[in-house]
Curated annotation (Swiss-Prot):
Source organism of the structure: Escherichia coli (strain K12)
UniProt GO BP: folic acid biosynthetic process; response to xenobiotic stimulus; tetrahydrofolate biosynthetic process
Binding site for (7,8-dihydropterin-6-yl)methyl diphosphate: 62, 96, 115, 185, 221, 255-257
Protein name per the record: Dihydropteroate synthase
Stated family: Belongs to the DHPS family.
Cofactor binding mode and count: Magnesium is required for activity, even if it seems to interact primarily with the substrate.
Required cofactor(s): Mg(2+)
Gene name, Swiss-Prot/TrEMBL: folP
Positions that bind Mg(2+): 22
PROSITE patterns to which the protein is assigned, alphabetical: DHPS_1, DHPS_2, PTERIN_BINDING
Disulfide bonds: none
Quaternary data: Homodimer.
Amino acids binding 6-hydroxymethyl-7,8-dihydropterin: 115, 185, 223
Keyword Transferase listed: yes
Amino acid sequence: MKLFAQGTSLDLSHPHVMGILNVTPDSFSDGGTHNSLIDAVKHANLMINAGATIIDVGGESTRPGAAEVSVEEELQRVIPVVEAIAQRFEVWISVDTSKPEVIRESAKVGAHIINDIRSLSEPGALEAAAETGLPVCLMHMQGNPKTMQEAPKYDDVFAEVNRYFIEQIARCEQAGIAKEKLLLDPGFGFGKNLSHNYSLLARLAEFHHFNLPLLVGMSRKSMIGQLLNVGPSERLSGSLACAVIAAMQGAHIIRVHDVKETVEAMRVVEATLSAKENKRYE
């Protein structure tokens, strides 16, 4: 399985680590730390050196209760960073946005993936994504970031997320986005309580029936904090456990804050999966 964008390809035969680069003042875990262009590029460089093969740039916090950001503000935050990374590094760049203007401008300056938590539901986003021809990650969310964690409710969380993916894939194909350009993200922590999150993690492998890349983001989230009763800065071990559980089930892209540690964990996963395939247990 491969993704193609900007004249390059990403081989998904092994798990990739996507490093999170929030250029926001209010993200839940690292808001305000990479706001200047120099700081953002430095942090991207650190993550690339640690083994990240994708950098996910986000200019609007999507934590529960987050305030919305204007188009102008998001463009000012995101575009210079995407452009600077594209000019300096041989790395895939993902842009975490829902706005058509940011989708278009990001593509022009070198972005490879559109990572939209709203699955191109904002007016004009679907058309903008189709125009760029870039791969798109579709994510499931119940409600919106402001209200999603108030009282998430499902009869069957796996069935509902699965049905959502079916509908969104069809919607993208009708708009001219080829199925092979799509990635799927179950949306851990987006309109889901503790039991919903772990139900999805336990059944992650079942989403392979779509034959599309799976992207997961659980790093430092409340599904770990609530379980272990620790704050965001103390969630590394839980984040690594979630990353390993996902990768052992064939997740293709793991979106994280702690790149070095996750890359090392993925090497252990790869060695295990390859031993399983080869039936070599020396």
